[in-house]
Design a protein with these regions (language model features):
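N- or domain-start disorder-to-order transition segments that initiate the globular core
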Residues: 2-43
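Short strand->helix junction
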Residues: 55-56
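A generic, well-ordered mixed alpha/beta core segment in the N-terminal half of proteins
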Residues: 67-146
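Terminal, contiguous helix-loop blocks that mediate binding/assembly
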Residues: 148-150
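Conserved small/polar residues in nucleotide/adenosyl-binding loops
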Residues: 156-163
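Conserved, mostly hydrophobic/aromatic
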Residues: 52
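Generic N-terminal targeting/processing segments that precede catalytic cores or assembly contacts
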Residues: 28-46, 61-75, 82
Length: 164
């Protein structure tokens, strides 16, 4: 299998500076992270519910969904903490086919990893801004986490782990 480097990615700190998480949204994330920690440490009676589709590849549709989920969250927030799952990668056994927004932010265009990372940052930031809900994403490529760790909660896994 051949590999061609089309361009170098910027350093995560540089990309975060160019597409920053506004301070008021960073405070929301900090508060929600603390709430999640309290739940997992048994200091809260709430349950965490991570919910969302298997693929998030359209910003407007995703944000519409998260806005509707935020309304549900308002009704159950005394018992549950809802975390939208905004899954921006699609695992492929053979490596063929659409691999998700990370690789190809526009399914009708050629893959572009940098544009994908930017699109994901924008989408997650918009979701927080519109709803106050921070998101979870699944990182198929843990090295991408450093581009998004200020915005979302992530779980790193492989398809191999899923089959155990």
């Amino acid at each position: 299998m051949g590999m061609k480097i089309n361009a170098e990615l910027p350093l995560p700190a540089n990309l975060k500076a160019e597409y920053p998480l506004p301070k008021e949204l960073a405070e929301i994330k900090k508060k929600r992270d603390a709430e999640i920690r309290e739940i997992f440490e048994g200091k809260s009676d709430k349950f965490v519910v991570i919910v969302g589709p298997c693929s998030a590849d359209n910003e407007d549709s995703v944000c519409d969904y998260v806005n509707r989920l935020a309304k549900v969250n308002e009704k159950v927030s005394d018992r549950l903490m809802i975390i939208p799952r905004i899954y921006t990668n699609k695992p492929r056994t053979t490596g063929e086919g659409y691999k998700g927004m990370l690789h190809q932010p526009d399914p009708d265009q050629a893959p572009n990893l940098l544009e994908g990372i930017i699109a994901i940052r924008r989408m997650h930031i918009r979701a927080i801004k519109e709803t106050g809900l921070t998101s979870a994403d699944e990182m198929l490529y843990p090295e991408n986490r450093s581009y998004l760790d200020d915005i979302l909660r992530s779980e790193e896994h492989t398809s191999e782990l899923q089959s155990r």
